[in-house]
Swiss-Prot record:
Single GO MF descriptor: phosphoribosylaminoimidazolecarboxamide formyltransferase activity
Reactions listed under catalytic activity: (6R)-10-formyltetrahydrofolate + 5-amino-1-(5-phospho-beta-D-ribosyl)imidazole-4-carboxamide = 5-formamido-1-(5-phospho-D-ribosyl)imidazole-4-carboxamide + (6S)-5,6,7,8-tetrahydrofolate; IMP + H2O = 5-formamido-1-(5-phospho-D-ribosyl)imidazole-4-carboxamide
InterPro entries xref list: AICAR_Tfase_dup_dom_sf (IPR024051), Cytidine_deaminase-like (IPR016193), MGS-like_dom (IPR011607), MGS-like_dom_sf (IPR036914), PurH-like (IPR002695)
One GO BP: 'de novo' IMP biosynthetic process
Pathway: Purine metabolism; IMP biosynthesis via de novo pathway; 5-formamido-1-(5-phospho-D-ribosyl)imidazole-4-carboxamide from 5-amino-1-(5-phospho-D-ribosyl)imidazole-4-carboxamide (10-formyl THF route): step 1/1; Purine metabolism; IMP biosynthesis via de novo pathway; IMP from 5-formamido-1-(5-phospho-D-ribosyl)imidazole-4-carboxamide: step 1/1
GO cellular-component term (any): cytosol
Domain MGS-like: 1-148
Known EC number: 2.1.2.3, 3.5.4.10
Protein family membership: Belongs to the PurH family.
Organism ancestry: Bacteria, Pseudomonadati, Pseudomonadota, Gammaproteobacteria, Alteromonadales
NCBIfam families named among the record's database cross-references: PRK00881.1, purH
Protein name (Swiss-Prot/TrEMBL): Bifunctional purine biosynthesis protein PurH
Length: 530
């Protein structure tokens, strides 16, 4: 192999010991001398693997409760030594070359994620010797292999088996990149953690004692796929994902069939899935260009799909469909026999439904798994030269949060539709207006520059599909600055309104609702979406 290097001596020191016994046994069987530290050394010895403790190798004991183990010239000289250049000085100082370093780091992320984690706990889980060895081996990848991921053990062993115990330069270089990615992520986590423990700073900072937003944001995403193009065909694109995401998402979903997801597919599927997660009853959300164009809940997902689809069949063409229950055969048949769809995503897919969808080979079918509570990730938006960072909009309202501000009280049925409509409005681009009747959208007005025009668009959409607006409720993601939005809603037949309130002209808006005999409730919470 080109620029291959034989592996004769390896240093193994891992916190995550998954797979290390089998890996070490194979190295030993291939005649590789193994050095190790602390718990790793003990584990290998207990499994009858020939191993030398690092302190015996260096002649210098572990000290300071294990804080100093591998920080020794015999270790770092062996890792950093340049083959063909440093042999004389190595011989003079009794330093032997180390050809393979296998290290993963103290579990800092897991430690600080514990509710009872103290600052002292966090500090003691900051690895020093590990990253030092990792960086040293990665720097000297010309001569040394560095393994930080247990998933690479089989790959390394296979190459050694096929190439007389040697690793090619290409492999060592690739492993070095992974090593630097690993240490960058590790140091970033530490910086983020400590950054939340000091006063905020920067323009307009109020100097809080602690801030959930760190001084710097260090994030790492790994490329999941390259794409044919981005939002438009002249834009290149790729999809990157975070490590260890626990929440069901488009990033973690399994694609069961269909063409590769496009940039727009992923963006729209994310919007559909996050919306359908809001509902506990069987629900269907149909999305086009990241806006819900039809949403419904029902006793089963087939009826929910029927309700969502009839809101706007025209926009549903080529859309994304999300469910919060397993996709069954009847629902799958209803979809594929009726409309062209880009993506269907559900927690799971029945075998019968999968067979039906398979008749449309290009249709992308995703299973995202069940979900529980949403995680508290940041919502991040890129602007030229910076990032806008905020909490995710997980604001919820219940019946107890609603303030009736009109003379007429909403009926029980209206209240149920109001809360449903409010959930949908959170996922519609501002200015957002949503008409709802009987747990299904009737009209959606999205993205207009004036709120009254969003209300008019919702009415036009409903009329185009011959849907009866009379008796529907209306939600608005932000307050009405003028009464014209209420007048437009009344003209369309809206009976009840839910909105945040808070306008300087609230009294005029309330008076307009009273004039039209409408009920109206304030939530005290806004749901702008840009």
């Amino acid at each position: 192999m080109e620029n291959s290097r034989p592996i004769k001596r390896a240093l193994l020191s891992v916190s995550d010991k998954a797979g290390i016994i089998e890996f070490a046994k194979e190295l030993s069987a291939r005649g590789v001398e193994i050095l190790s530290t602390g718990g790793t050394c003990k584990l290998l010895a207990e499994n009858d693997i020939k191993v030398t403790e690092v302190s015996d190798y260096t002649g210098f004991p572990e000290m300071m409760d294990g804080r100093v183990k591998t920080l020794h010239p015999k270790i770092h000289g062996g890792i950093l030594a340049r083959r063909g250049i440093d042999e004389v000085i190595m011989s003079e100082n009794d330093i032997a070359p180390i050809d393979l370093v296998v290290v993963n780091l103290y579990p800092f992320a897991e430690t600080v994620a514990r509710p009872d984690c103290s600052l002292e706990d966090a500090i003691e889980n900051i690895d020093i010797g590990g990253p030092t060895m990792v960086r040293a081996a990665a720097k000297n990848h010309k001569d040394v292999g560095i393994v930080v991921n247990a998933g690479d053990y089989p790959r390394v062993l296979k190459e050694m088996q096929e190439n007389n115990n040697s690793l090619a330069y290409k492999t060592r270089f690739d492993l070095a990149i992974a090593a630097y990615e690993h240490t960058a992520q590790y140091d970033g986590m530490i910086a983020n953690y400590f950054g939340t423990m000091v006063p905020s700073y920067g323009e307009n900072s109020e100097g809080d004692l602690e801030s959930k937003f760190p001084r710097t944001i260090n994030m790492q995403f790994k490329k999941k796929q390259d794409m044919r193009y981005g939002e438009n065909s002249h834009q290149s694109a790729a999809f990157y994902v975070e490590d260890d995401i626990q929440e069901a998402s488009v990033s973690t979903a399994t694609q069961l069939q269909g063409k590769a997801l496009s940039y727009n597919n992923i963006a729209d599927t994310d919007a559909a899935l996050e919306c359908v997660k809001e509902f506990s009853e069987p629900a269907c959300v149909i999305v086009k260009h990241s806006n819900p164009c039809g949403v419904a809940v029902a006793g089963n997902i087939l009826d929910a799909y029927e309700g969502a689809y009839k809101t706007d069949p025209t926009s549903a063409f080529g859309g994304i469909i999300a469910f919060n229950r397993e996709l069954d055969a009847k629902t799958a048949e209803a979809i594929v026999s009726r409309q062209f769809v880009e993506v269907i995503i559900a927690p799971s897919v029945s075998p019968e439904a999968a067979k039906i969808v398979a008749t449309k080979k290009n249709l992308r079918l995703l299973a995202c798994g069940e979900w529980s509570d949403k995680t508290t990730q940041f919502d991040i938006k890129r602007v030229n030269g910076g990032l806008l960072v905020q909490d995710r909009d997980q604001g919820m309202v219940g019946l107890e949060d609603l303030k009736v501000v009109t003379k007429r009280q909403p009926t029980e049925a209206e209240l149920k539709d109001l809360l449903f409509s409010w959930k949908v409005a959170k996922f519609v681009k501002s200015n957002a207006i949503v008409y709802v009747k009987n747990n299904a959208t009737v009209g959606v007005g999205a993205g207009q520059m004036s709120r009254v025009y969003s209300a008019k668009v919702a009415g036009i959409k409903a009329a185009d599909e011959n849907l009866v607006v009379a008796g529907s409720v209306m939600s608005s993601d932000a307050f009405f600055p003028f009464r014209d939005g209420i007048d437009a809603a009344a003209e369309a037949g809206i009976s009840c309104v839910i909105q945040p309130g808070g306008s300087m002209r609230d009294n005029e808006v309330i008076a307009a609702a009273d004039e039209h005999g409408m009920a109206m409730v304030f939530t005290g919470m806004r749901h702008f979406r840009h």
